Curated annotation (Swiss-Prot):
GO terms for molecular function: adenosylhomocysteinase activity. The keyword Chloroplast does not apply. Belongs to the adenosylhomocysteinase family. Its EC number is 3.13.2.1. It catalyses: S-adenosyl-L-homocysteine + H2O = L-homocysteine + adenosine. The lineage of its organism: Bacteria, Pseudomonadati, Pseudomonadota, Gammaproteobacteria, Pseudomonadales. CDD domains: SAHH (cd00401). Pathway: Amino-acid biosynthesis; L-homocysteine biosynthesis; L-homocysteine from S-adenosyl-L-homocysteine: step 1/1. This is Adenosylhomocysteinase. NAD(+) binds at residues 165-167, 199, 228-233, 251, 300, 321-323, 375. It is found in: Cytoplasm.
Amino acid sequence: MSAVMTPAEFNDYKVADISLAAWGRRETIIAESEMPALMGLRRKYAGDQPLKGAKILGCIHMTIQTAVLIETLVALGAEVRWSSCNIFSTQDQAAAAIAAAGIPVFAWKGETEEEYEWCIEQTILKDGQPWDANMILDDGGDLTEIIHKKYPAMLDKIHGVTEETTTGVHRLLDMLAKGELKIPAINVNDSVTKSKNDNKYGCRHSLNDAIKRGTDHLLSGKQALVIGYGDVGKGSAQSLRQEGMIVKVTEVDPICAMQACMDGFELVSPFIDGENDGTEASIDKALLGKIDLIVTTTGNVNVCDSNMLKALKKRAVVCNIGHFDNEIDTAFMRKNWAWEEVKPQVHKIHRTGPGSFDAQNDDYLILLAEGRLVNLGNATGHPSRIMDGSFANQVLAQIFLFEQKYADLAPAKKSERLTVEVLPKKLDEEVALEMVRGFGGVVTKLTKTQADYIGVTVEGPFKPDAYRY
């Protein structure tokens, strides 16, 4: 898409600077060339218009790659309204390009918490009234939660939600268990072409980039502690190892802990004998006193707590590549220590008490992105080729749910369909095949004899649902 409209013709948006649209358009065109799966779906399904009639509320990082996602949804027939799921992650040129194309978007880099909530509200509302949306595309679950709590009547017309992240999936499963979830959900996060690409390979690329942009530090030879060794933690540990860091890992899951050991990382705990009793006495101060960089990757709360922050080496860098800013106890830091802004999304946290500080003091931590997503706060996030798989999954998930027409079902049928499910493996394989073609790769085809021997069809799916890639 390349249409550019003037603000006089269209004003259903709020971005930092609409004059950045031409820049955003140039970057979007480049991103399209690096997103073969998404563009392949656009070409494959444009004639059928499978999303014609879909009205999608979207809340996901408003980046250049998201611009390609949005315009793919529109090209397949959808109408959308958009906001960002993070106050620091918007690329203003991307938001401007989408607004200039006549698509409602409310996002800018550096929103306050109040502005963030206002932007989500503007996504939900059109001309001051709830939009007649019938689909949700979410990242982290804030949009889904707001609609359930503040606009429950809208749920009668909504066919479902597709969720991008681990954090959002946890929230959906919690809502389902409590009987609070009113629409079916597709767990995009656990599609193989999302979790292995975005969570693992994406973090491998973007974590070290963000730290270096934020600090200008040489990382080689320094000690890092990665908290968590799920897919995000695996990619993060590799990212730091690539820089020549001495990487240690902490984990609560024995299986992930075993994987860290097998991958050659030292498994440690910031707590003596691995037990956190909530006091400074349980902290392994000898360990944390040598750590130059700590990265949280878990999607859990206070995994880098106040006692750990007190024990960290002077001038250590602290950052998060999970979803929310509560992985690091930033609330404690705000209440008890002085913050000095070095530049946007980079703060010296003086551990000498609240209020004023001595600029020459050397007892400080360097906090990146205020504890929010470091790769989008201090850099530009994952490459287009990585996000290609995630967003192709989102498109197929939106088509899948929209075709199911949950909102039109009889009540008895609705209760059967109220689930949180992973995208069918056949669609996961479709995304992977488009990505392979983008690399110029050639996939070998099974013969009929070979397919029969392992109990699959020649066209796939090629693995049982229980297979772990």
